[in-house]
From Swiss-Prot:
Impact after mutating residue 276 to T: Small constitutive ion flux
Family designation: Belongs to the tellurite-resistance/dicarboxylate transporter (TDT) family.
Lineage, uppermost ranks: Bacteria, Pseudomonadati, Pseudomonadota, Gammaproteobacteria, Pasteurellales
The protein's name: Tellurite resistance protein TehA homolog
Cellular localisation: Cell inner membrane
Length: 328
């Protein structure tokens, strides 16, 4: 028996040398988008009886995919540790690791309707996890020498911006609204500081084709920000919410114009980078609709977001059936 275990470990070691782990960390964008869309549908429960069923189905699928990916990442930590280490120290790819605590919090948000205790545990794990990761990894960049202008990619929004906004929303769900404001402030200031740096980089140099799908992350900050804000202020659509929504739509128009350039080399799973922004657009649209504010725009935003994420799902299924989903 030990002989077979030794052979298996040697085989795994050989595989590590010859091929990458089949699941990139960026693929956590799939349960991210599905979970956020589930929450958007949940907020329509009092308007459409079927909305709860749609939300539950999306939530169950998102949670199942998240569990699968977490197990695969645990396997990666065990047998592909050098690849994990390289990703952590990469000036670009390290940001995608933040998707793990972000999705953990969103799955906690979904589970809250069924099991508040487990949900709260997941939300706190995600909140503490993202804060520790940002503290350890992002602070290293302040030491200099490890970050260059070309390292400025949209994925850099994830650790300090998206993660803090998600913490704000999740903590508000648990009733910690004041604490949520702290994370909201952290995310908003981080966004304001990083946004001009990224836009300046995009103006003076082009993203490589393999990184262009990450442009979808640019859609997220404004819509995730307004969703977090509406969570902690009890859903009141005030002037700030309208301002944030307006900026989100401006980014949407820019990205629609750039989309042919983004997919110049073909469709790929990386396009799920758009999903968090799209789902947060739908989520905030429900609050605008409930508040009788820009109801026509909110209906369009909700329908558009669902159609776009539906197309991402169809693309993913196609890639799976063609054997093009996992890295080889």
């Amino acid at each position: 028996m030990l002989h077979f275990a030794h052979i298996f470990q040697n085989k795994v070691h050989t595989m590590n040398i010859t091929k990458p782990f089949p699941l990139p960390t960026g693929y956590f964008g799939i349960p991210l988008g599905l979970a956020a869309l589930s929450l958007a549908w949940f907020h329509l429960e009092n308007l459409f009886p079927a909305a709860r069923m749609v939300s539950d189905v999306l939530g169950i699928v998102a949670s199942a995919v998240w569990i699968l990916f977490i197990l695969m990442y645990a396997y990666k930590l065990r047998y592909y540790f050098e690849e994990v280490r390289a990703e952590y120290h990469s000036p670009v790819r390290f940001s995608f690791i933040a998707l793990i605590p972000i999705t953990t919090m969103l799955v906690g948000d979904i589970l809250y309707r069924w099991n508040p205790l487990i949900a709260e545990v997941l939300i706190w794990i995600g909140t503490i996890g993202q804060l520790l990761f940002s503290t350890l990894r992002v602070s290293e960049l302040w030491q200099g020498g490890v970050f260059e202008q070309k390292s400025t990619h949209p994925s850099f929004y994830l650790p300090a911006v998206a993660a803090n906004f998600t913490s704000a929303s999740s903590l508000a769900l648990l009733g910690y609204h004041d604490l949520g404001y702290l994370f909201f402030g952290a995310g908003m200031i981080a966004w304001i500081i990083f946004e001009p740096v990224l836009l300046q980089h995009l103006r003076i140099s082009s993203l490589e084709p393999q990184f262009r799908a990450t442009m979808g992350i640019v859609l997220a900050p404004a819509f995730v920000c307004v969703s977090a804000y509406l969570s902690i202020n009890h859903g009141e659509v005030d002037t700030l919410a309208k301002i944030l929504w307006g900026y989100g739509f401006l980014q949407l128009f820019f990205l629609l114009r750039l989309f042919p350039w983004i997919v110049e080399k073909g469709l790929n799973i990386g396009l799920w980078a758009f999903s968090f922004g799209l789902a947060s657009m739908a989520n905030s649209a429900t609050a605008f609709y409930h508040g009788n504010v820009l109801q026509g725009v909110s209906i369009f935003a909700f329908v558009f977001s669902n159609v776009m994420i539906g197309l991402l799902v169809l693309m993913t299924i196609y890639k799976l059936t063609k054997g093009q989903f996992f890295l080889k």
